[in-house]
């Protein structure tokens, strides 16, 4: 098994800053935007984007935490640990996750969102898009496109959970 670091902490910070600038440029009314991080690492990325938006625009956008497990089609979990302190009906919700792969987690996140309200618009921001979609889902904001083979694995580490920021690719062969 071979592990290779492909994104270090500095590059990750730049990618998050780039996503933040794109959010500012593409959303005319930022006061209608709600950030929704997908547990676990997507929540921490959402908080960083929220912090950068505050630094750049002086806005304190609401942020929620989406638990996709109860909405997945490949597992059965009853407990839903979603935290959404704002009504998302009529809001522009930006889903935020660490890796976009098959699209199944995003589908589950959208199912969770519509159970909470009816957003005006839903868009997707991901740190890494690795390809290999099984569903017709694409990211609106991408930090890094990293094409992989289907046997490789992308591992995102964030300092809040893992003690460091980095993205690695693992080749099991």
Swiss-Prot record:
Record's keyword annotation contains Transcription regulation: yes
An individual GO BP term: DNA-templated transcription termination
Keyword Cell inner membrane: no
Molecular functions (GO terms): RNA binding; uracil phosphoribosyltransferase activity
Residues engaged in binding substrate: 40-41, 97-105, 130
Keywords: Glycosyltransferase, RNA-binding, Transcription, Transcription regulation, Transcription termination, Transferase
Organism superkingdom: Bacteria
SUPFAM superfamilies: PRTase-like
Catalytic activity: UMP + diphosphate = 5-phospho-alpha-D-ribose 1-diphosphate + uracil
EC number per UniProt: 2.4.2.9
Motif (PRPP-binding): 93-105
Pfam families assigned: Pribosyltran
Assigned protein family: Belongs to the purine/pyrimidine phosphoribosyltransferase family. PyrR subfamily.
NCBIfam families: PRK05205.1-4, PRK05205.1-5
Assembly behavior: Homodimer and homohexamer; in equilibrium.
Protein task: Regulates transcriptional attenuation of the pyrimidine nucleotide (pyr) operon by binding in a uridine-dependent manner to specific sites on pyr mRNA. This disrupts an antiterminator hairpin in the RNA and favors formation of a downstream transcription terminator, leading to a reduced expression of downstream genes. Also displays a weak uracil phosphoribosyltransferase activity which is not physiologically significant.
Name of the molecule in the record: Bifunctional protein PyrR
Lineage of the species this protein comes from: Bacteria, Bacillati, Bacillota, Bacilli, Lactobacillales
């Amino acid at each position: 098994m071979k592990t290779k670091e492909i994104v270090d902490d500095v590059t990750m910070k730049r990618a998050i800053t780039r996503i933040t600038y794109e959010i500012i440029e593409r959303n005319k009314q930022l006061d209608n935007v709600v950030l929704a991080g997908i547990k676990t690492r997507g929540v921490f990325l959402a908080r960083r984007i929220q912090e950068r938006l505050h630094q750049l625009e002086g806005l304190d956008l609401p942020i929620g935490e989406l638990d996709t497990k109860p909405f997945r089609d490949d597992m059965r979990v009853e407990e839903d640990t979603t935290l959404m302190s704002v009504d998302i009906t009529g809001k522009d919700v930006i889903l935020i996750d660490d890796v976009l792969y098959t699209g199944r987690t995003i589908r589950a996140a959208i199912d969770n969102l519509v159970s909470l309200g009816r957003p005006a618009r839903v868009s997707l921001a991901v740190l890494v898009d690795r390809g290999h979609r099984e569903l017709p889902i694409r990211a609106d904001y991408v930090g890094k496109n990293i094409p992989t083979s289907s046997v490789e694995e992308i591992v995102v580490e964030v300092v809040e959970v893992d003690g460091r920021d980095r993205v690695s690719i693992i080749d099991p062969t």
